[in-house]
Amino acid sequence: MKSPIFAALTLAIASAFPSVAMAQSNEELLKELRALRDRVNQLEERLKASEAKPAAAAAAPATAQWGMTPQQAQDFNRIAVKTEALEDSTEALGLKNLKISGYMDPSYIYNRNQNRAGFQFLNNVENGGYHYDNSYIGTVALDLLKETEGGTRWHLTLSPNRGTDAVIGNGSVIQEASVSIPLGDLQTRMIAGHMPDWSGYEMLQPTLNKLVTHNLLFDFTLPTAYTGAGLELTRGKWITKAVLANMNSSMQPAGEKSPVIAYRVDYSKGEFDGFGFAGVHGKAANGVGGTGSTMLNLFEVDGYYIRGDWTLQGQVSYGGQKQASITPNPDSGALRNSEWMGFSGLAAYKFSPRFETIARFDYLKNSKNGGGLLGFGADPRNGIGPTMTGRDADTGDLLFGDTERGANRTALALGINYLYDLNTTFKLEYRYDRADRSVFELVKDGSFSKSNNLLGASVVVKF
């Protein structure tokens, strides 16, 4: 049976071209009609194929979707929904880009001259003050660092009893409370708040300090913290920070209006070494009572080389303050200027990835006008001041020999570190302190010595 479409086309062609049909032979006409029929059949086949594709596509997910089974596709969709909900919740709670870390270092200290030995942890700095045998030893800290979408950083570190704010006399748990705000780009920032001092090669945190104790320059010649505002600039390998701030004071007392300028410049020469320098210039409180704030100038240069198993670090410092010497002029009684200079060097070598030995040597020259360091007067526990001969029987005040010359100090520390795991380090240190004057008090019998011995141990745990 012939196709009705074929018959209709035959009649149409015959009607439209009667003269051509008569001129052509029957055989030629049949060839043309067969060709036309084949073409029509091809069009019909293509139409059927196009109608069958949507049905096949609709049935495909029942068997597979993107190379997954239906169950796998359902699990994937469920995970995607939960992930989006978790991201929304994290952002709503303020936890996005929030880093929480912390550390603690329960310690044991033996001090020969103080006739003291025992564990040391979270002792209040108000009970006995700041000394080289307690400083930031036996602390705990919680660190919160939050960065917003725009690049602003909010930094809060809490450390009870022995934080920087407690050391400067406020008694709070604040160690750092600062903000860093980008100005135009992330390499130019405004910094403000309460910031620990950044001078020297040694860091405040026990996680970044190889020994249990700190060097002489860290303890006696550097500021504790700044409260103020300034800029931080990053330009290639250079990082510069400068602030206009109160030094060691969260608020200026009545009658004081002059802040200090504090700055720090670091240069990373390469992967293994670098150097930096820091300074403080301006009026600050001194260790002589009743003088108020006087002009202070501090400057130090430090550097490091860390490659393979070796670590080398060093620092040279100079400082001086007006009317801050321990002893006044013997003739006029007028207060005189204090001045000091010193250096510290540290070398460490790892015999294995876990086992490290450390040696540190410090020297501090402080002989001018009976001595006097940053915030320190005569101190028989720290070994600062002129020759000490005893104490007054009635008042207990120190008695001095030659008051014109203060003691120069040295300290040698030898230590061992053992990295128990990625978060735990055991430290052991022996330290020998010496002075060229009798400035260390032996509390057992009340005599004075030129030297002291200290043994310290701690376990530093961080997360």
Labelled PLM ranges:
Residues 1-22:
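Gram-negative bacterial Sec-dependent N-terminal signal peptides
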Residues 13, 22-119, 391-393, 397-398, ...:
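N-terminal periplasmic/intermembrane-space "pro-region" immediately following the signal or transit peptide
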Residues 24-25, 32-36, 40-54, 83-84, ...:
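A general secondary-structure boundary signal
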Residues 28-32, 44, 151-152, 186-189, ...:
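Generic alpha-helical hydrophobic packing signal
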Residues 86-249, 255-262, 266-275, 343-369:
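Outer membrane beta-barrel
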